């Protein structure tokens, strides 16, 4: 049975974006990477997609979806240093009336202990800022004034939050990969996944 994966794909493009995994699978297969099933090589590539089709831009690509080529390009240019923000799965993302995008963080839990990392494509529904001051709800997690250094004011408390207009149900998605180098049992992996989901 399959015990591991060869790559994980996050993509925009709604269901069309699942084709990106095909591009990654083809590139892996050419390199002989994948699950061995007799004489066949089957790359194991789970994928998740977000809905960003109503963000403007040209979606009339004709009979050939661009996503397999985008997946292959992502595979070929993959490195430890990668672009955040308007890149990859986060390219067409929006969040609460602002530009969404791709974010990442990792940390070692203790000296010499395991590392936990997260890669998130944010295309979320809802409001991101306090209604009066415009301070981000996450202001207390700000590092080096990355959100502009705006602090909430007393008038924010109890004020109605302005929700951006939604064009329809199911048109916002946030997807993530949460990973660790800790050695986990199957039941520990399940608990890790539950905690990651709750954090999302």
Kindly label every feature range from the protein language model:
Residues 1-15, 19-22, 26, 30-200:
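A structural signal for small-residue-enriched, beta-sheet-centric alpha/beta enzyme cores
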